[in-house]
Amino acid sequence: MANVVVIGAQWGDEGKGKVVDIYTEFADDVVRYQGGNNAGHTLVVGDEKVILHLIPSGILHEGKRCVIGNGVVLDPEVFIMEITKLKANGYLKDDKMLLLSEALHIIMPYHKRIDIAREKKSGSKKIGTTGRGIGPAYEDKIGRRGIRLMDLLDEKAFTRKVKEVLEEKNLILTQLLGEQPFTFEEIYEEYMKYAETLRKYAADTSLILHQEIKAGKSLLFEGAQGTLLDVDHGTYPYVTSSSTCSGGACTGSGVSPREIHEVIGISKAYATRVGSGPFPTELEDETGEQLRQAGREFGSTTGRPRRTGWYDALVARYAVRINGLSGIAITKLDVLSGQETVKVCTAYNYKGQVLTEVPASLEVMELCTPIYEELPGWNEDITGAKSMAELPKNARDYVARVEELSGAPVVLVSVGPRRDETIVLRNPFQLD
């Protein structure tokens, strides 16, 4: 029995979905603990491409229970669309295998309208929000004005709480943002329909997960976004609104930290970022475009082209420290095939000063330029490699150097998008 947290060790989009899909084989329950449908996990199963935004990747494995924890903000419309599509494709044959925490917060229509309107007004200072209402929903959660799933399922509580908050939301929409207001009736009619579907999935998931652990079951916690997008530890304010780091697995699920055995950080063999914010190793040249095209670096949620850059060892070390990583999974190593040389950022130059750690100040990080170590590349197609020995020497040397600079052992190397295009060096579910 082991309980494992999988988190993004960069700025999100690291390939967590594929790694979670592989690890799900060894878990009994897969838990999503933060974020909302601003995240997108792309999985390739056989010849089928599946994109999930809310439901844990474990849903593609029969017999695995999937849990959406209290730390998630849920858009009922998106959730229902996702389960409908999954069922149409032969997945989720038993509704009891998908649970929603009664304590999770619901994304309301005013959250989405406020989110989009604020971003429009921001002009050049845009954060890069997906416009899906995630941030405003978390604002209401912290401000104690949120609507939880348990409220949605209680008609009287829902009516009272929405009426209490709607006057304020309409003032913000009309007076500050120049947008149309909502009537209570339109929200009530729409969300009571959602309640009928969501009711069958609602549960005290913290208690159920506790019971699973006591019964000797293994849990896999599936993070969304990445360490540098964490609301506390990321490049604030260019962050998401939730706790993307490993600590969020406990607060977002109701599982004790004492029950976590392994934390695996997922990191691309290079780096990407979506939206605004500092990105020291960004490549705005032909090489950056080559990586974008070879890696198909376009957001699964927004379709936006991702910013690309070389691997940043400072970011990796930061992720190891903040999350307590016991291992790193390197994804998309195959994307680097064909590069004459590959680079790793080993330090930053800040006004002539050499920095070996990620600076706390956003203003400092924005002025940092990378100091690179250059390694020889490789031309071979590595997608068929089943072991490290089958990789070209230069590819092996690159992985070894990344491991050395990051400060945590590499436990998995992905050499292609398919599930079987993976080299597993250590299974975190098999404790020593």
UniProtKB/Swiss-Prot annotation:
Entry binding sites for GTP: 12-18, 40-42, 306, 332-334, 414-416
UniProt keyword annotation of Translocase present: no
Protein residues bound to substrate: 300-306
Domain of life of the native organism: Bacteria
Family annotation (InterPro entries): Adenylosuccin_syn_GTP-bd (IPR018220), Adenylosuccin_syn_Lys_AS (IPR033128), Adenylosuccinate_synth_dom1 (IPR042109), Adenylosuccinate_synth_dom2 (IPR042110), Adenylosuccinate_synth_dom3 (IPR042111), Adenylosuccinate_synthetase (IPR001114), P-loop_NTPase (IPR027417)
A Gene Ontology term for the protein's cellular component: cytoplasm
Positions annotated to bind Mg(2+): 13, 40
A GO term, aspect molecular function: adenylosuccinate synthase activity
EC class: ligase
Compartment(s): Cytoplasm
Family annotation (Pfam families): Adenylsucc_synt
Any one biological process term the GO annotation gives: 'de novo' AMP biosynthetic process
Reactions listed under catalytic activity: IMP + L-aspartate + GTP = N(6)-(1,2-dicarboxyethyl)-AMP + GDP + phosphate + 2 H(+)
Cofactor dependency: Mg(2+)
The protein's annotated pathway: Purine metabolism; AMP biosynthesis via de novo pathway; AMP from IMP: step 1/2
CDD domains reported in the protein's UniProt record: AdSS (cd03108)
Active site residues according to the UniProt entry: 13, 41
Cofactor remark: Binds 1 Mg(2+) ion per subunit.
Subunit comment: Homodimer.
Similarity section: Belongs to the adenylosuccinate synthetase family.
Biological role: Plays an important role in the de novo pathway of purine nucleotide biosynthesis. Catalyzes the first committed step in the biosynthesis of AMP from IMP.
Protein name (Swiss-Prot/TrEMBL): Adenylosuccinate synthetase
Source species of the chain: Geobacter sp. (strain M21)
